Amino acid sequence: MAAKKLKILFVTSEIVPFVKTGGLADVSSALPQMLSELGHEVRIVIPKYGAVDDRKFKIHEIVRLKDLVVKIGDKDVMFSLKSCFLPGPRVRVQIYFLDNQEYFGSRNGLYVDPKTGKDYPDNDERFILLSRSVMELIIKLGWIPDVIHLNDWQCGLIPAYIKTLYKDQESFDKFKTLFTIHNLAYQGEFPASTFKKTELPKELESVSKGIMHNGKVNFMKSGLMFADVINTVSQTYANEIRTKEEFGEGLKDVLAKRKDSLYGIVNGIDKNVWNPEKDKQIPKTFSAKNIEDKLVNKKELAERFGLAYDEKIPIIGLISRLFDSKGFDLIQKAFNDLMKL
């Protein structure tokens, strides 16, 4: 029996080739394309930051998604949702861009102000708007997804909205939410005064049953509490964050309560991009059939970084930020064994 073809709404705060700060942007591009190739109907929602080029990507207005209004605390905030297709060689995946000049269009930084190096002070309002815009998108389009796939704290309020503020909305009981933890260390923590801005019901302004944590509103906790299913990047990590304080980032107990709904799924790669046999970004393509050609790339890498080249001495290049979460401690532990290979 063939697997059911799903309608999937994928919500993210960054995506290649439009904007990127980390691996989330790569996943947000590759996964929807692969799901679409498998026959699912996938649509994406993302903020339209100032760095996104309308003309280059042919982003256009949608009349019925123009000049919508939601409340953020005492403010009426107007926004529109524009659209284009995710550039890809095989499938066309539709993207909806949340367009608001004040919160997104006037800023090139995604979360951090490039001028100060600090988080934007209104990040709470910015991503409240993202959450509310997703609700309004579904209502206005009448396109009811089977699954809403949410990524990291920036999307964490959406499950809470679905189960409270929008619970009586027609057809909102028909879809399920999947919340993916990409980086548990970043939780979207804001002052208690942020709660009023969310418009969520008073009962969620608690620690035991709501979105408060250590005296602050915690967007990540909201996603963990109210999503139907949670996943993270490996089964080992999924076990660690719910059983060990050093991995749980203060949310171990919350995750432990959701253990039956918490899964580990290892990220894959797009073999059409990460394929040395046809990669245009490396000096010399190679494959298992002509592995010796890899030495050309090794020599080029050594020269680029001013290293003495020796065919017999290994060079390891990593595309990564230098954070503990990237597993550099594992390389350190295995280093002596690696050198014996």
PLM regions with names:
Residues 1-341:
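Catalytic cores of nucleotide-sugar-dependent glycosyltransferases that transfer UDP/GDP/TDP-activated
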